[in-house]
Amino acid sequence: MKKTIIYSAAALLCGIVSCNNVETHPAEGSRTGFALSFFKNVNASAEPDENVVVSPYSAGVALSMLTQGAEGQTKVELDNALNGCDFKAEPLGTGDTVVVRSANSVWIDDDFSVRNHYVDVLEKEYDALATTLNFADPATVQAINNWCSEHTDGKVNEVISQLPSNIVMMLANAVYFKAPWLDQFNERATKDEVFHGQSGDRNVRMMNRKGRYAYAEYQGAKMIEIPYEGDRYSMYVILPPADLNMKNIGTYLNQSVYESAVKMLAPAEVRLSLPKMKIETSLNLNKTLKSMGVVTAYGSAADFKGISAMGPLSLGDVAQKCYIDVTESGTEAAAVTTISVALTSARPDMDVKVMKIDRPFLFLIVDKQSDNILFAGKIIDL
């Protein structure tokens, strides 16, 4: 049975406010750059037979809250991993038919003292809910899970099962997205078709529609933009060459290649086939973050004196759970990222294009008015 992993980069949703540049990072901060780097590193640490769905946006917000309490080399490494970006609270463009929301929280053990300034920053700049509870009480786990469920419309429920005795604080971000397609698929056109997955062929429910889409072909791949109502958010689907091993998709997650492909998108008549899918997965992001240079935070040299005078503190587990449901009417997606802190010692082409997504592919859900990527995914089996 194939394994499925949901990363906080599952579908890509871009936020409104551009990131703040940080002097410690050699390049100009870009949320797209962070999102693609995060997605690429998640893929590198995933098993070959795993689907990957992540929310780079949710991970970025949670890590930004952690960075506010970091100092010294620990802060430098976190800033660099974030590509110099700070994902502070921002409006995400909810409309009459499109629902996009993000919520933040910080949970503090009642035996642990947090600096007032740190809590003030989280409350004022990240609109975070700060709650002090007894971490030894099992009801605290339920309270955190209830908060996650409430802010993902019940799509992400049991985020944690226990709080180890050395955990004194937990940060959480929840993001929820629900939007109808600008041009919906006709359910009567949906039929059983073969998806040529990495582990073999399998019948799936394939949605079909012929219409006008922004479309591009580059480096042997195809890209299509499928807009949602309001035309602010879109899903970008990338169909790599049929003979490409999905372990080698790094080229298509290169920022310059991705941005060049988006600029190449041009109106075309497309016969589109897109599989229906509902995926729920969870992921531990520790290995991913270490591969992005966040090393000091996990050891005895961690510097989180901006959080508390009690210590020393170090980074515990960074985890993410995701959900995505793609149907004829639209898309619903949700993600929760948790961070535990431990006390330790081109021109239009009028030809009809065909884009049958019946083999492994990449997708991104983006906010075209901003530099955020909320969800991204690599689907190799259905």
Positions of predicted regions on the chain:
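Detector for small/aliphatic-rich hydrophobic stretches
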Residues: 5-8, 19-135, 146, 368, ...
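Repetitive helical segments and hydrophobic/amphipathic motifs
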Residues: 11-12
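Non-catalytic, conformational "gating/processing" segments within enzyme and secreted inhibitor domains
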Residues: 49, 90-243, 263-348
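Short Gly/aromatic-enriched secondary-structure transition segments
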Residues: 78-82, 185-194, 248-256
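Long, His/Glu/Asp-enriched segments that create or flank divalent metal/ion-associated functional microenvironments
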Residues: 351
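Short loop/turn motifs at secondary-structure junctions and domain boundaries
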Residues: 354-359
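C-terminal or internal capping secondary-structure element at the end of a domain, subdomain, or sheet
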Residues: 361-382
